[in-house]
Amino acid sequence: MLAILLFLVATQTDLLSSHGEKAVVLLFVGSDCPVSNRYAPELQRLFQRYSPQGIDFRLVYPEPGFTVDAMERHRQEYGYTIPALLDAGHQYVTRARAGVTPAAAVFIRGQLIYLGRIDDRYVDIGKARPEATHHDLEEVLAAAVAGKSMRRRQTKAVGCAIENLQ
């Protein structure tokens, strides 16, 4: 288990460089965040649709003190098959500048090109639309698969704050 965690920390730069992949997507999730947990089916759908097309996905658990066992239980409970990693030291949070869960960060050749919401289903905490009307992350992924050039963009993610490290 320790070897896996060390490998994940040691390969941060390599992961974000997207060698051979069209993009790397970090999906920041919180095990205790209701908004984040409600997005599990959508995140899994995006993974199943875009990973065969060259998009590399990782669930990122930024919770200090979270364990590999707790991460695996959460993944199982919510039906995730997306590869996951712990980010208790906030290396990925810092690199992406993520502040809430759920949030997505998309990197192409090591450059952050998107940070923000999955879609616009949540307008604010406690205020949700029945269905999303704008699918921000999916638009970015479709453009990456098509090889379109993109400028960096950011949207406001709604969810639970990522706890600061003391």
Please describe what each predicted stretch is.
Residues 89-165:
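Thiol/selenol-based redox catalytic cores and closely related redox-interacting motifs
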Residues 37-78, 86-95:
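Structural microenvironment flanking redox-active thiols in thiol-disulfide oxidoreductases
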Residues 19-34, 141:
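Short active-site neighborhood of thiol/selenol oxidoreductases, capturing the structured segment around
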Residues 2-21, 28:
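N-terminal "domain-start" segment that seeds a small globular fold
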Residues 30-34, 59-64, 126-130:
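Second-shell loop/turn segments in exported
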Residues 23, 34-37, 65, 131-135:
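Soluble non-cytosolic domains of exported or imported proteins
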Residues 21-24, 53-57, 80-82, 101, ...:
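Loop/turn elements at helix/coil->beta-strand transitions in domains of secreted/extracellular proteins
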Residues 24-27, 56-61, 83-86, 115:
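Structural recognition of the beta-strand scaffold that forms the well-ordered cores
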